[in-house]
Design a protein with these regions (language model features):
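C-terminal and inter-domain tail/linker signature
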Residues: 2-167
Length: 167
């Protein structure tokens, strides 16, 4: 079969389409893996008292909008910082452990548990020295690998029960 000078070989076109499809899939997988790595680094930073105060909030964009945190705090990055500092003070050894990470587009949903020891004031509770372990879920929205929105749900009833119930 002869082809004219500018005519495209159908086999070459098919191969180019396959390559472009592969590149697109690889790019999508790469960006999903990048977000997974960002979230893992976020948890590692949150869990490390030696670096968290200097690095944790770098994962969040200045335009951050938060949901599911105490209503008396602003729903922006400053309000979020206030709440996290309160957590770190009340539970200096607090750790977050992600059990599931689900990613779609620019959103990451994490199912996790928090664990720690109550060593400082938390809401109306004086330090009890008690250990706690509570479940939670968070949805992050990203732009340029920075978190721009965060929805949070933590089992605060269980936390309160664990801190106040007498053994």
């Amino acid at each position: 079969m002869t082809y004219l000078k500018n005519q495209i070989d159908p086999d070459e076109t098919l191969m180019e389409e396959k390559v472009l499809k592969y590149i697109k899939q690889f790019s999508i997988m790469s960006s999903l893996e990048q977000l997974r790595e960002v979230v893992r680094n976020l948890a590692d930073t949150f869990n490390n008292p030696n670096v968290r105060e200097s690095s944790y909030f770098d994962f969040y964009d200045d335009s951050l909008n938060i949901h599911g945190f105490p209503p008396n705090l602003p729903s922006n990055k400053e309000g979020f910082k206030q709440f996290i500092y309160l957590l770190w003070k009340a539970f200096p050894d607090i750790r977050i452990i992600f059990e599931d990470i689900i990613i779609e587009g620019n959103k990451v949903v994490c199912r996790y548990y928090l664990t720690g020891t109550h060593k400082g004031d938390f809401e109306d509770l004086q330090p009890t020295g008690r250990l706690f372990n509570v479940n939670g879920m968070t949805e992050f929205s990203f732009r340029n690998e920075k978190i721009i929105e965060r929805w949070n749900l933590v089992d605060m009833v269980s936390l309160r029960e664990q801190l106040t119930t007498h053994a």
